[in-house]
């Protein structure tokens, strides 16, 4: 039995890396060890700088600015993770999600967070994607607006019950 089957508990993988997606990630999904995954800029930075799997795409993107390069690499991996998790999501709408975080520099900019959240969600174009938003005053506004548009949201950086309540 699994935690999901035993107590309806879903584990999410907090790691994304291109080679991992094609090997262990597939395996732990198949074995029902995880039911979703999340990412953030720090995870991607570590993956991109420590894996040769990104070299070809990095070479093709080298003329772009850092944000564009990061987004292209991250979106490629998020789209792949969404595809790998899609069967889980089809079988249980509460599972099979992958999340991508908005630019952390937007944490105090509700309008910027909303704009970026809509853009990221649209560019990935998968029902099982969540936009990860920090639990700040601006983030609460963005969370409400994005969910009203039918965009899945993953609240992050919650350190108190008060913050958690404000995310609803």
Predicted regions and their residues:
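Conserved, mostly hydrophobic/aromatic
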Residues: 40, 100, 131, 146, ...
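Short, charged, surface-exposed secondary-structure boundary motifs
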Residues: 47-48, 162-168
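Glycine-enriched alpha-helix->loop->beta-strand junction motifs that scaffold or abut catalytic
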Residues: 33-35, 142-153
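N- or domain-start disorder-to-order transition segments that initiate the globular core
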Residues: 1-24
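An N-terminal structural lobe/cap that precedes and organizes the functional/catalytic core
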Residues: 20-56
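Active-site beta->alpha loop and helix N-cap motifs at the rims of alpha/beta catalytic domains
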Residues: 43-140
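Catalytic beta/alpha-barrel core
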Residues: 14, 127-136, 151-163
């Amino acid at each position: 039995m699994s935690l999901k089957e035993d107590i309806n508990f879903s584990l999410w993988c907090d790691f994304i890396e291109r080679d991992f997606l094609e090997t262990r990630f597939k395996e732990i999904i198949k074995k029902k060890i995880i039911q979703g995954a999340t990412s953030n800029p720090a995870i991607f930075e570590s993956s991109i700088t420590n894996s040769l799997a990104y070299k070809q795409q990095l070479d093709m993107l080298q003329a772009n600015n850092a944000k564009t390069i990061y987004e292209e690499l991250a979106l490629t991996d998020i789209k792949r993770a969404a595809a790998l998790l899609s069967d889980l999501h089809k079988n249980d709408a509460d599972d099979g999600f992958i999340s991508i975080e908005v630019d952390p520099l937007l944490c105090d900019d509700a309008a910027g967070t909303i704009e970026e959240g809509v853009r990221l969600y649209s560019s990935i174009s998968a029902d099982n994607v969540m936009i990860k938003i920090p639990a700040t005053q601006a983030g609460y506004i963005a969370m409400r607006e994005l969910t009203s548009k039918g965009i899945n949201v993953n609240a992050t950086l919650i350190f108190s019950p008060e913050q958690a309540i404000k995310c609803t």
